[in-house]
Amino acid sequence: MLGKLARQHDPNVLVGFDHADDAGVYQLGPGSALVQTVDFFTPVVDDPYTFGQIAATNSLSDVYAMGGKPLTALALVCFPEKGDLEILERILAGGLSKMIEAGCTIIGGHSIRDDETKFGYAVTGLIDPGKVLRNGGAQPGDRLLLTKSLGTGVISTAIKKGLAKQSWIDAAVSSMTTLNKIAADVITAGHVETTGHVRTGASTVQTERSSVVTGQRPNSDDAFPVHAMTDITGFGLIGHVREMALASDNVSVRLYSSRVPLLEGALESVRAGHIPGGLTANREFAECAVRYEDGIAEEIKTVLFDPQTAGGLLISVASESVGELKRMLTSAGVPAVEMGEVLPRAGDLIKVSS
C-alpha cells in the first residue's frame, strides 16, 4: 500500500521500500547509517515466555539480513483489557532474554487494548553505509545457501490445532528462537563484494560493489563475495527467492527440492492438512513464476511456500567461495545448506528440480 502514496525524496535514504528489502537504511554521516524494521504478530506457541522469545528473534532478523548490528528496540504490545498480566509479563521477559542475547537494548514501547494478543518490536540497528547487504545483486553462477530448515508455518498450525507431536514442537521452537546473529556475524566479517547489478525501480544500475559493500578482510584468503542476502519469513522460500531474482539483473533461480532442509514434522503437517492461510496466499501469488521438474511431490511443492517465523538467511554467494563460506558457517554452529543456484534469465523465473 505504501507504494501507492506520493514518494518522499531524501538523499539520505539508502534503502527504502522500492524493492522489498528487509529493512530501511538511513545514512547519518560518513561511515554511519541506521537500519530500521518493525514486526509483530499473534502467538504461534502456547507458552508466553517462548512466544516472547520467538517474537524478538523474528523482529531482530531483518537487521541481521541487511548486515547490521541491532542497537535498540521498542516493544509493541496488543493485549486484552481483562487479560492476565502475568502472561504479558512472561511474554515481555521472553523477549528481553533474546534482546540481551543480541546485545540490543529495549528503550521503551507502546501498548493498546486488543481482544487478541499481539507482540513484537521496532528495532533500530547500525551499519556502515558501504557494507549494506540487499536482496538484489545475485549473479549468474552464484550458489544459494540456506541457514535454517523450513516448516515453522505448517507446524505452528498443527500446534494451534493441538495435533503436533512434541518432537515437532521442540524442533520448530528451537529454530524460531535461534537468532541469525552468528550467521550474520560470519558473513559480514568475511565477505567482499564485486561489481554487480541491482534493479532500482524500472531501471537497472551497475554498482561498484567493492565500494558499496566491502568486508573487513577483503585481501585475506578467507574473504568471499556475497552478492545478495535476505531472510526467509512470511512469503516462504519461493516468495523470497522470487523477490531476490526480481531485484537482481536478468537472472533466474534453480532450487533443488531434495536439498532444501525441512524441520521434523513439516511434511507430516502438510499431509495432514495443517495449511496456514499465509501458505495458500503465498502459493496463489507466486506459483505463476515457478516451473517444476516432473516428479516433484505435491507436499514438497507446498512446503516451499510455507510462511516462516524467524526463518533462516538465504545467501547468494559466488560459486568459487561457497565451500569456504559453508565451512565457516558450519564451524560457527550454523547448519548452512547449499540448495540452489543462480542462472542467466531464460524462461521461468524459478525452476524447481529434484
Residue ranges and their predicted role:
Residues 1-200, 204-209, 214-354:
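Helix-biased detector of long, well-ordered alpha-helical tracts
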